[in-house]
Amino acid sequence: MRVMLGITGASGAPYATRILRALSDHGADVGVCASAAGRQVIALEIYGDRGMDGGDALERFVADHGSPDTRIWAERDYSAPYASGSSRTDAVIVCPCSMASIGTIVAGAEANLIHRAAGVQLKERRKLVVVPRETPLSSIHLENLLRLRNAGADVIAAMPAFYHLPQTIDDLVAFVAGRVLDSIGVDVTLHERWGESQVGAP
């Protein structure tokens, strides 16, 4: 399974961490691309260091949570397979997805490889999952999310549930990550599902 994980400048890097780890454990062929703002978010939210070089943060992030085969793609490296519809990509996940990136994708514009890959998935009618993390939402945000959904994307907002009685922040992260993985057909259980009493190992 070929998957691209795009990381933009919205808060929510821990979700990307859990998704990358699960995909790697599942044996997926994963490529990671982070925008400049996304790299800064990783440095702050994963490593707690605002001054950390974004490139170093991304490399450490992939080394810590990916597999040895996980590849980092530069923000504007359009030689990546995800940049063309002729190279079949099973899923593109943009997590976290900023509202600026949502607007760019909806407009059919391309400021980086993440936007290009998302556009390719839409035109080829393949799986695109975006995980927005913003509040409150303006009418522009809501309209853009609706347009993106109508274009074929799965919109999985970073809204964790509480019916599984989470005990830690990681439990909340796992709920959202699990819904993303469900959306692309990866059969792992990161959280207790409704009606189930036990959680299987990821």
What are these language model-derived features?
Residues M1-L128, P136-P202:
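A cross-family phosphate/adenosyl-ligand binding-site feature
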